[in-house]
């Protein structure tokens, strides 16, 4: 039996991507294999000794946690929900734990929405049978400050394509057409019908999003390559949601 390390568990509304606006329970896992310069979840970068549970009441639970224990914690969030968002950090770093947790949640009737940085295909392979949605956050060098990992992205997308999949690109003022074309061609190799979401970066730590005109240009540049492109900013910071 493996154990997991969780940053927090809470009930809120999905603030980005294709399912923006739906009610979800969120499980934010600790640790990440990347170090993006404009990361907006710094609290999830390292393992922690306890995690918060925020629903109708606010309580704390000790780490590490068993799959059965975490499923029980989720059952305390009694709000109606569309799905459970498995997020991070990078949740696939705890793939063996997810392989124990997700079957339990599926037996309880939950729909599983996985948010991943799309760099750990072997870990996704372990759990794909229990996932319903994959939000693949393909990282651009202009936004992260790190080289893109397109080969890992390609392999993961081929696995994820058997489920409901979309690709998210966080874009900044400096994002180039060449980056967008490369990312678009990567997605088209898997399927031209995979939706691609352009998400303007949250102004944080010096990050600047593209202006409205440039976002339209970016959408057109991607639209030459794949069938469905959407510009969707994060809504939870605007509305004060978690």
Regions found by a protein language model. Give the residues of each.
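Short secondary-structure boundary/capping elements
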Residues: 62-69, 148, 152
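Conserved alpha-helix/loop element of class I SAM-dependent methyltransferases that forms part
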Residues: 73
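N-terminal [4Fe-4S]-dependent radical SAM core
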Residues: 1-66, 76-78, 241-242
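Conserved AdoMet/S-adenosylmethionine-binding subsite of the radical SAM
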Residues: 80-83, 92-230, 234-242
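Short, surface-exposed acidic-centric catalytic microdomains
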Residues: 40-46, 50, 70, 127-129, ...
């Amino acid at each position: 039996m493996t154990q997991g390390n969780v940053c927090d568990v809470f009930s809120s509304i999905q603030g980005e991507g294709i399912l923006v606006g739906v009610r979800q329970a969120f499980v934010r896992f600790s640790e990440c294999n990347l170090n993006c310069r404009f990361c907006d979840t710094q609290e999830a970068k390292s393992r922690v000794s306890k995690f918060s549970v925020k629903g109708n009441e606010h309580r704390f639970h000790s780490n590490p946690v068993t799959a059965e224990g975490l499923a029980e914690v989720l059952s305390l969030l009694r709000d109606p929900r569309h799905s459970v968002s498995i997020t991070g950090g990078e949740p696939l770093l705890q793939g063996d734990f997810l392989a124990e947790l997700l079957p339990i949640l599926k037996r309880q009737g939950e729909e599983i929405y996985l948010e991943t940085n799309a760099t750990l295909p072997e870990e996704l392979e372990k759990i794909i049978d229990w996932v319903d949605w994959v939000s693949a956050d393909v990282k651009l060098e202009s936004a992260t400050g790190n080289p893109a990992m397109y080969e890992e992205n390609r392999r993961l997308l081929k696995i994820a394509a058997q489920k409901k999949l979309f690709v998210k690109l966080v874009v900044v003022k400096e994002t180039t057409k060449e980056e967008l074309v490369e990312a678009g061609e990567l997605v088209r190799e898997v399927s031209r019908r995979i939706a691609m979401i352009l998400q303007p970066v949250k102004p944080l730590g010096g990050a600047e999003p593209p202006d409205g005109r440039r976002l339209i240009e970016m959408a057109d540049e991607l639209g030459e390559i794949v069938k469905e492109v959407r510009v969707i900013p994060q809504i939870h910071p605007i509305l004060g949601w978690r």
